[in-house]
From Swiss-Prot:
Master enzyme that delivers sulfur to a number of partners involved in Fe-S cluster assembly, tRNA modification or cofactor biosynthesis. Catalyzes the removal of elemental sulfur atoms from cysteine to produce alanine. Functions as a sulfur delivery protein for Fe-S cluster synthesis onto IscU, an Fe-S scaffold assembly protein, as well as other S acceptor proteins. GO terms for cellular component: L-cysteine desulfurase complex. It comes from Shewanella woodyi (strain ATCC 51908 / MS32). Its EC number is 2.8.1.7. The active site is at 328 (cysteine persulfide intermediate). This is Cysteine desulfurase IscS. Keywords: 2Fe-2S, Cytoplasm, Iron, Iron-sulfur, Metal-binding, Pyridoxal phosphate, Transferase.
Amino acid sequence: MKLPIYLDYAATTPVDPRVAEKMMQCMTMDGIFGNPASRSHRYGWQAEEAVDIARNQVADLINADPREIVFTSGATESDNLAIKGVAHFYQKKGKHIITSKTEHKAVLDTCRQLEREGFEVTYLAPEANGLIPLATIESAMREDTVLVSIMHVNNEIGVIHDINAIGELCRSKKIIFHVDAAQSAGKLPLDVQETKVDLLSISAHKMYGPKGIGALYVRRKPRIRLEAAMHGGGHERGMRSGTLATHQIVGMGEAAAIAKADMEADNARIAGLRDRLWNGVKGIEETYINGDVEQRYCGSLNVSFNFVEGESLMMALKDLAVSSGSACTSASLEPSYVLRALGLNDEMAHSSIRFSIGRFTTEEEIDHAIETINKSIDSLRDMSPLWEMFKDGVDLEQVQWAHH
């Protein structure tokens, strides 16, 4: 068993060896190394064909037309292109956007930028279970609302939003609907023929593909128009100029094909491991799951261990690669803004750990994790004066702390 045990699949996934193998064939002189836009010789034609195959594989994953797939550098760029692209193209129709407080920073900071440009953004607060009720979204809609952006699966707590219902609502009001599917594409079934989503962001490195490549699904019927953010050779039907990175695109295509084929089996195994982990730690006193228990992705488990400081717990769990929030914000010691939005106080938000399980996690690793967590919590609480007070029946909410 390799230490530390990797339980941070929501931050990134290792590249599947089958994907790496395919990518290796697209780099050197004896492989498919040409520029897909070179139309005058075989090197270009071969690269173009490889990109076409990958585009079809990504489209297949979400049941889209391959012409609706725009390759980007990742879900962050896809989110930026979708939100800014719609806002700028349709601004004469209206300048109001709806999103949620628990979105990824790639959506929140893009919306903040649009606010600086004169757009108005409504940030919806979730219920305590992390979900946003349909009625909340509907009541925020106005005549000048041009876009709703709600993620499919939350990166920190794993809750699943009902994008089918939100899509129906948006379509009935003629409002464009963008979904950040970075955490769900390749893990949950997605069908853009059934779901009325207009724009959908996908990341390759969350589904065992390479980093630095993603895609944006842009609906053709009814047609969604975007203002490009990257200008140049007019690649990707003018929406995203720049020479296509054949090896990364081929990697993403292969990852999508494997994800589609193995999704059911992968999820059944991962759900079993997640349950095994939760059953092994839920007996610890004052331990709580964050986010809805039913409507959640099976690979995600966000747990608060009360009366334990998150950072010291992370250090005690040095054999486990886990995080206390998302990788994109774990550089800051602020408590998770997602957990704060659910109504958790600073202490509970600080004592939470995100475990995310994936394709290469084993039972042996989960059992080792359970043992490590139980030992660590016990020893950290033994050192905690707050735990002692709590066990003595002191109501910590009522304590007046002296400020020095």
